Amino acid sequence: MVNTAAEMKAIVDRAVYPPVGSRSFGPFNAPFASLDPRDGFAEYYQRAKGGGVAVLPIIESSEGVKNCEEILAMEGVTGCFIGPYDLRLSLGVPGGIDGPEQVMRC
């Protein structure tokens, strides 16, 4: 769960290679993240460095919604997930799947 741009910055810093982040490169393990067994560490590094690492924060609090534009605008962020049930609770709306208009009002 991400609530602020500062939290997101710390996540991006650890998930993305320089110059955007400071993720270290492990040439012996990183290539195994590839679905193509022919890829070596050089191919993986180039793909990951060029935006091939998905960084997807989960927004599931009222604070996260309040700060979502700043969170999602950060370089290195590639999308997001919404945690609807925890978000409902954070907004003071009882749990369940009904009443989306209640959540939108909050």
Where in the sequence are the language-model features?
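Expand to "…catalyze enediolate/carbanion chemistry for C-C bond making/breaking, isomerization
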Residues: M1-C106
